[in-house]
A protein has these predicted regions:
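N-terminal Rossmann NAD(P)H-binding glycine-rich loop of SDR-like oxidoreductase domains
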Residues: 3-23
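NAD(P)H-binding glycine-rich loop region in Rossmannoid oxidoreductase-like domains
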Residues: 39, 45-90, 98
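Catalytic helix-loop patch of NAD(P)-dependent Rossmann-fold dehydrogenases
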Residues: 86, 119-164, 185-188
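Glycine/proline-rich active-site loop of Rossmann-fold NAD(P)-dependent oxidoreductases
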Residues: 140, 154, 165-175, 209-221, ...
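NAD(P)-dependent short-chain dehydrogenase/reductase
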Residues: 149-195, 200-202, 209, 238-239
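Mid/C-terminal beta-alpha module of Rossmann-like enzyme folds, strongest
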Residues: 213-275, 308, 312-315, 325-328
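Amphipathic terminal alpha-helices
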Residues: 290-297, 302-335
């Protein structure tokens, strides 16, 4: 295959490019900075300089591919709505504009966040129902743009991904360790809510399977672990893997939301980032359940990595890298 990937320096995009190159596919990846360019070169793929938020010659380069995987996004629990829309919506529009009258397979990486945080069971066919957070709204709007392009003839699939973690993960372990160092870990609610996570290798396997099969325009897939443990179990796995102890303190969701609201007010006044956001609280207390039944049937896909083993491998990776190369705790990534 010839594949063009946006977000080639991001967590998912970079892992995908590496896997594609190992399999011998021709890959070009969009890189918006010299650092991103260097990361793409490390994978043995061809970097294409450009930014999805700015139309340019990279749009013609995207047509090189038999498959285009749109992995670039701004992912964060905090930030101006205009910035989420600039990257996630306008960026998607730019890549779609470049692919008009192109006859390849477009794979749009979306998120289970398009459903917001309303408790319930969701399937691949459940419509987006965002929760007024700019990240959720922007991902839902990006899906709408893809659906419009499909009506105009684009061959496109959409992939809703759960919370991703694994070696190379920019946030998961770093943020967790911040709490451990304080001696206390706060969890929203009783901790019996599903963790809704998926290991990076399982995501990449799913994306490869989608890329290799004939496109069913408009088909949505969900990549999530169907038997992921609850949040409290996740915390216990991580503490065990780190060989650390910390007091686990459940906090009622209404209290957590109130604290986060105050943090956000202070941050707006101080023009700084809050240590806790309402989005993070709702995500941690999320009681949504996601079915992957259709995805499994169509792709023959199922997660190979248990969450317990996945957490252990992530911790092992984190311990091996030097402190200077460890990721920051700021959960924002525009790749």
């Amino acid at each position: 295959m010839r594949v063009f990937v946006t977000g080639g320096s991001g967590f998912i995009g970079n892992a995908l490019v590496r896997r594609l190159r190992r399999e011998g596919h021709e890959v070009r990846a969009l890189a918006r900075s010299e650092r991103a360019k260097a990361m793409v070169i490390e994978t043995d793929a061809i970097p294409v300089r450009g930014d999805i938020t700015q139309p340019g010659s990279w749009q013609d380069e995207a047509r090189f591919g038999d498959v285009v995987v749109h992995a670039a996004a701004l992912v964060s629990d905090w930030g101006p709505r205009r910035e989420f829309y600039r990257v996630n919506v306008d960026g998607t529009k730019n890549i779609l504009d470049g692919l008009k009258k192109w006859d390849g397979h477009f794979i749009h990486i979306s998120s289970i966040a398009v459903h917001g945080f309303r408790p319930g069971a969701y399937t691949e066919t459940s419509p987006a129902s965002p929760d007024r957070h700019p990240y959720c709204d922007s991902k839902a709007e990006a899906e709408r743009l893809v659906d419009m392009a499909i009506k105009e003839g684009l061959q496109a699939s959409l992939v809703r991904i759960a919370g991703v973690y694994g070696p190379g993960d920019p946030h998961f372990i770093a943020r967790f360790l911040d709490q451990v160092r304080s001696g206390r870990i706060f969890i929203v609610g009783k901790g019996d809510q599903p963790s809704n996570l998926i290991y990076i290798d399982d995501i990449i396997e799913g994306l490869i399977l989608i890329a290799k099969r004939k496109c069913e325009p408009g088909q949505r897939y969900v990549l999530s672990h169907p038997s992921a443990p609850d949040v409290l179990s996740m915390v216990q796995y991580a503490l065990k893997g780190l060989k650390l102890r910390a007091r686990v303190q459940p906090v009622p969701i209404w209290i957590a939301v109130a604290v986060a609201s105050l943090q956000e007010i202070r941050s707006h006044l101080a023009k700084s980032r809050p240590s806790l956001t309402r989005y993070a609280v709702k995500a941690m207390g999320n009681r949504c359940v996601f079915s992957t039944e259709v995805t499994a049937q169509k792709l023959g896909w199922s997660p190979k990595m248990s969450v317990q083993e996945g957490v252990a491998r992530t911790i092992s990776w984190y311990r091996k890298i030097s402190p200077s190369r460890r990721p920051s705790t700021t959960p924002a990534q525009h790749s």
